[in-house]
Design a protein with these regions (language model features):
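Short S/T/G/P-rich N-terminal loop/turn motif that feeds into the first structured element of a domain
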Residues: 1-51, 57-71, 78-104
Length: 104
């Protein structure tokens, strides 16, 4: 599994709920259509910071999400709300747990 983490700084704090709603309504459905898509999480940090975690089977699949997200920001007219490009970290997931204890 491959994770791609995006950190957006300088997000307009008064529109965080609007962004989150649009992510759920219009971005997530697009990401779900990508081959290898496993999950997506949007985290509202503080002080105008949004982070997202996307999970995919391969790094190539995760890389394709970058174009979709960039186009989505423009299509939704969020370039003024999310004015800065994200800091992106990506790599292979080396430890994973689902929180369910193992059966003995």
């Amino acid at each position: 599994m491959h994770a791609i983490i995006r950190r957006y700084e300088g997000v307009e704090t008064t529109r965080m709920n609007e962004v989150a709603g649009k992510v759920k309504e219009t971005l997530v459905p697009q990401l779900r259509e990508l081959p290898g898509f496993s999950g997506y999480y949007l985290i509202e940090a503080s002080n105008g910071v949004l982070s997202s975690v996307g999970l995919f089977d391969t790094s190539n699949q995760a890389g394709k999400s970058k174009d979709i997200v960039t186009k989505w920001i423009s299509d939704e007219s969020f370039t003024s709300v999310i004015p800065n490009p994200p800091v992106i970290t990506s790599g292979e997931v080396v430890v994973q747990t689902d929180g369910v204890p193992a059966l003995v």
